[in-house]
Amino acid sequence: MDFAAAKIAIDRLIDPNVDAAAVGRELDRLTRAVVSRTPAGLTPRARMDVLLSTLYTAGDWNDHRPFRYDLDDPMGRRRENKLLSTYLRTRKGNCVSMPVLVAILGQRLGLVVTLATGPEHVMTKFAGGENWLNVEATAGGYKWDSSYERDLDISARALETEIYLRPLAPREAVGVMASTLMEALAAQGRADDLMAVADMVLAVNPTDVVAIIQKANAYYLQLQQRYNSRYARPTDIPPGLQADYAMRSRANLEWFAKAEALGWHPPTAQNRTRYLQSIDQEKDTRGQL
């Protein structure tokens, strides 16, 4: 599974104007830059260190334009900021584009890499020996699972069901990349297409909670488009459509319940406030540099 090809294909479904050839050329350039800075005989961990420094430390290898966390849009709320082409152009990334680029380059360099997820977060997993290491791409370093458990408020149930922090199989990692496509389809109200993509992701990883939630959202959008926008009350729906309406209403709730049973919970205002405060502190720190 070629992570670069998959990410470019997904991004072009979101924005057909993405220049696949230009993205490929920039990935080639970055790959060559890492290779040129990597002495022979390094351990996998040391090779990953070179990859990270090539991205995040200013030098001739990145035209003195290091890649950085976008503190103005850290969550990638502006969907175009999650596109690989945007990240490569602006050098400002988020918790989707940054780990995906590390995984793409790591794969090209022959390192054992994949993606893993946390609540509203994606990280790169790297096999540096017998154990997997978390590469926190937004900070350009490494992080323990226990730190994510604390910082992201991951529940004991979520750890038990392994919906978070598990090193994903390559096809499952591509499903994580498809989360941005699902966001775009939901925003456009393309309920049937959203359902189709969610089903494809779930066929590969039945416990992908983002896809589970998006499947619930797809049922909600179908209800809005087919019934709630046309009929003032459920009793006004024609008898021949009542069974379909009931099925979709039930399925919407059932898929949300499935996510909760796996240990997912909606982000709390407290956690988001704490995270945004850390971003403000980082902005102040950068302003003092």
Map each language-model feature to its residues.
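A structural boundary/capping signal
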Residues: 1-289
